[in-house]
Amino acid sequence: MSPLVSPLGRRNAGLAMLALALPRPAGAQAQDSGTILVPGPEDGGCARWAARAAAVLTRGLQRPANLRLSVLGGPDGVTAANRFATQEGGNDARFLVLPGWTCHVRLTGATRARFEPRGWLPLMLTWHGALLAGRGALPTRPLVPLRIAIPSPDAPEAAALAALDLLGITAQPVIGVPEAAFAAGEADALIVTGPDPAARARAMGAVPWYLLSTPAEGQLSEIPPFPVTSPAHRGVLAAVAGLQMRAALVMPALTPADTVAIWRRAAMRWPDEERAHPDLGLALIGTGAAGAFAILSPPPEATLAYRSWLDQRLGWRAG
C-alpha cells in the first residue's frame, strides 16, 4: 500500500468517481436541458429568433446545455401555443416562442386559440415601439372623417380606428395595407411600429400623435402617451402590442422557482448580445419583459371591451 494514500482516502476517491459515473438527479438535468416549441416554418422568422435565443441561453448557463427546437404549426403561433398549454410537465425545462400576433388572435376571441397566456413566465422578448400618426397635426374636429386603412377587422392594425374612437375623433375604416394606403393618399392615419417609430413615421411624411406604449416610456418622449382611463383603452393597447412584440420566450406558469431562476440568469446576456442587431427591436428581460408581456394579456374586462368594439363598430365576431 502506498504511504501517500490511506485506505480511507482510497475509499473516498472511489466514491467520488462512482458519483461522477452515476446519472444526475432529474432536477439537475432539467437545469441544463430543455425543449423550445417554435411556430413554423422551420426556416421562418420564429425559428431564426429561437435559434438566437437558444444560443444566448446556452452561453449564459456557462456550462454544456442541450436545448432542442421543436417546430410545430404555422407562423401565427396558435397551434404551438395550444400544444404548449396542454403539455404535461417533465424533467426537462419547457419553453415556447410566442409572437405577439398569437396573443392578438386570442384577444379577438377566435375559438381556435385555446390557451391562456396570462400566467406564462416571459424570460426574454423583442419589442418594437408604436405610435399613432397621421397626416399633419391631430385634428380635434375633422371636417370629414379620417380614413383608417386596415387589412381586416381582426388585424391588430384595426386598433388605430379604435384609438381614434376613444379620442372622440371621427374616422372611418377603409380596406387596405396601412402604410401602402397612406403613401398613396388613401388613408389619413395609421399605427407605426419599429425600433424607432417616430423616425419611421416622419420618413413616410406622417406626424406622430400619440405614443402607444406604457406611460413610463411616454414620459421620456416628446410624444404624449395615449391616455389609459378605461378597460377599453387597455384593450386597444393590447391589440397594438400584437404588432409590438416580435417574439417572446416563455415558460409554463407552474415551472419550479429554482428552474426559472436558473434560466433567468442565463437570459441576462440577451440585451447585450442583441445590441448587435438594433434593427430587430428592443431586447427585454426581467421586469421589462414582464411589463411588456402583461400588455398583451389585459384584464378580462379590457378583452371584452375590445371584442365588443369589433362587433359593434366593424360588425365582426370571431368564430
Enumerate the language-model features and the residues they cover:
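Short, hydrophobic beta-strand segments that form beta-sheet elements in well-ordered domains
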Residues: 149-151, 190, 209-212
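Short boundary motifs at domain starts and secondary-structure transition points
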Residues: 22-29, 136-141, 239-240
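N-terminal export signals
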Residues: 3-4, 11-28
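An extracytoplasmic/periplasmic, membrane-proximal ligand-sensing/linker region
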Residues: 261-319
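Hinge/capping helix and adjacent helix->loop/strand transition within the periplasmic-binding protein
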Residues: 61, 86-92, 108-181, 246-277
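N-terminal (or domain-start) structured segment
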Residues: 28-119, 152-156, 165-196, 200, ...
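C-terminal lobe and pocket-closing loops
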Residues: 200-266
